[in-house]
């Protein structure tokens, strides 16, 4: 899905809360990390955007209370015997927030827009398994050749290039949501603004104030509106993790986006009932800019920096939230994957340090030729502390001089996509669904802007292409493992740890169910005041 990313003054926050607090209205206040870049479902990337979009829109399928797949805009579907053709029957009562019906044509329109090279969606590769999708987004075939057809207003047919075990799971993702063609044609790029946006989910966009909040109101046209208990949802920008915690303690937030790492041990003692730390399918990593030297042609240099990071210290002393050291990109426990263990994962840190020094010297660096590195990260004390610790490890073991540059969430995401970060950039990937392809597709040469290092390997692409058409799940898992081994041997990124989701959750919030994708749609929750 996705990437992790000024908080309101107390007075302004209170004003936002009060503005929707008339009568018996139920309000949920969510800490949401960084400022959302956009609410255009085809152009957004990060978690701050995706959580809001999951409340605003509904795909063919939807994440249920436990993160499981449940019917969304489609009430049912069938799959052909060869596993290549999916036929979806849309709900008769599916409506846009303006009262017009949601049709199969809305999905066809949206998917064509999604793949249009002019849209330049960072997620364009996401439905490459659909017939001709890849060629359309690369501009080599016209949009009308896409393997998606509106048989009638309530019947959508999708044809794939081969059996795809995870296809249904992709349909909960914001990139595959429908859009109202009439709405986009009326407002153009301004369709995402409050008062303009038409959505088909449980909520409508009521207000959006940059660096402050996004306010959603219950959608009376939603097919399950009678079951939605929360009337208003406020998503607050909370890049200041310490400030976010203080506002939670003051009762201004019902739950937080994350926790200050250094305060986790104390919080687990003093506020144990409200601390939630659970497994999460995601990897925190540093990406290396391969568009220029010295990174472009020195894999041994990149590998040396990776080996010199003591990941056990990182998760034990710095993050302190139950994270696990990462030596691969695909998190442990993912389905349809032949899990493997890199050599360095079984070594001591002393062995890794010795190898790092050898590789560093082999790359031509040392006391007579020192290396200077800039680490860029999005604003967060948590990210800063990690970067400081890693810089200290590199200095102590390899003599590397490190400078830190922090950027606001949107600026950092732009720098990553455009390869404008100088040397190394902090980022992460959180699984959109339980399949390793969701992680490994990022580094195809045709993946576009989300290929942050600018990695390109014909051999890697061939393995990933082979996995797409492999019907045998065991063989497919082995092929994907081979692709990851090749990719990590090239060391275009530096995995650091596997995530846990960690936050404060008020005991007043009911209906919350932990899940490894950390999807918690507001429609499934309620708040007892």
Predicted regions and their residues:
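N-terminal lobe/hinge region of extracytoplasmic solute-binding protein
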Residues: 31-81, 196-199
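Aromatic- and charge-enriched surface segment that lines or borders ligand/interaction sites
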Residues: 75-126, 157, 247, 295
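Alpha-helical secondary-structure segments
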Residues: 103-110, 153-159, 163, 201-202, ...
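Gly/Pro-rich hinge or "lid" segments in bacterial periplasmic/extracellular proteins
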Residues: 134, 139-143, 149, 153-154, ...
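Extracytoplasmic/peripheral linker and loop segments enriched in polar/acidic and small residues
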Residues: 148-149, 315, 349, 400-412, ...
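Extracellular/periplasmic solute-recognition and catalytic clefts
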Residues: 206-217, 234-292, 316
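Structural transition elements
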Residues: 325-362, 380-385
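Long beta-strand-rich cores associated with HINT superfamily self-processing modules
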Residues: 503-529
């Amino acid at each position: 899905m996705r990437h992790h990313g000024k908080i309101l003054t107390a007075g302004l926050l209170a004003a936002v809360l009060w503005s929707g607090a008339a009568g018996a209205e139920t309000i949920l206040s969510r800490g949401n990390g960084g400022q959302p870049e956009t609410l255009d479902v085809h152009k957004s990337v990060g978690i701050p955007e995706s959580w809001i979009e999951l409340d605003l829109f509904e795909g063919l399928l939807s994440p249920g209370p436990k993160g499981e797949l449940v019917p969304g805009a489609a009430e049912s579907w069938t799959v052909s015997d060869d596993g290549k053709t999916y036929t979806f029957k849309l709900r008769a009562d599916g409506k846009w927030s303006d009262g017009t019906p949601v049709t199969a044509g809305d999905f066809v329109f949206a998917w064509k827009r999604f793949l249009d090279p002019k849209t330049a969606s960072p997620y364009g590769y996401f439905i490459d398994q659909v017939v001709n999708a890849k060629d359309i987004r690369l501009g080599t075939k016209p949009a009308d050749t896409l393997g998606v057809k509106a048989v009638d207003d309530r019947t959508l047919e999708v044809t794939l290039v081969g059996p795809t075990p995870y296809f249904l799971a992709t349909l909960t993702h914001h990139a595959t949501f429908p859009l109202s063609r009439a709405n986009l044609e009326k407002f153009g790029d301004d369709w995402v603004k409050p008062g303009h946006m038409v959505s088909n989910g449980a909520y409508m966009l009521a207000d959006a104030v940059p660096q402050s909040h996004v306010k959603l109101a219950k959608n009376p046209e939603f097919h399950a509106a009678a079951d939605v208990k929360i009337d208003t949802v406020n998503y607050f920008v909370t890049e200041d993790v310490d400030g976010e915690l203080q506002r939670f303690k003051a009762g201004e937030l019902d739950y937080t986006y994350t926790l200050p790492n250094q305060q986790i041990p104390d919080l687990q003692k003093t506020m144990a009932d409200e601390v939630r730390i659970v497994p999460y399918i995601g990897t925190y990593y540093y990406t290396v800019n391969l568009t220029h030297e010295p990174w472009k042609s020195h894999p041994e240099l990149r590998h040396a920096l990776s080996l010199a990071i003591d990941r056990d210290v990182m998760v034990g002393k710095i993050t302190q939230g139950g994270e696990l050291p990462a030596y691969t990109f695909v998190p442990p426990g993912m389905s349809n994957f032949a899990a493997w263990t890199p050599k360095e994962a079984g070594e001591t840190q002393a062995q890794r340090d010795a190898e790092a020094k050898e590789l560093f010297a082999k790359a031509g660096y040392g006391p007579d030729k020192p290396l200077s590195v800039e680490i860029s990260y999005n604003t967060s004390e948590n990210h800063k502390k990690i970067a400081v610790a890693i810089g200290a490890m590199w200095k102590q073991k390899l003599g590397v001089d490190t400078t830190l540059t922090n950027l606001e969430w949107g600026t950092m995401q732009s720098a990553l996509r455009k390869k404008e970060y100088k040397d190394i950039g902090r980022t992460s990937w959180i699984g959109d669904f339980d399949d390793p392809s969701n992680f490994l597709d990022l580094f195809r040469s045709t993946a576009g802007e989300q290929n942050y290092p600018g990695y390109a390997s014909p051999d890697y692409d061939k393995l990933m292409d082979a996995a797409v058409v492999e019907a045998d799940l065991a063989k497919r898992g082995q092929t994907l493992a081979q692709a990851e081994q090749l990719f990590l041997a090239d060391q275009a990124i530096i995995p650091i740890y596997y995530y846990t989701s960690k936050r404060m959750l008020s005991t007043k919030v009911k209906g919350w169910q932990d899940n490894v994708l950390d999807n918690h749609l507001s429609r499934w929750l309620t708040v007892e005041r």
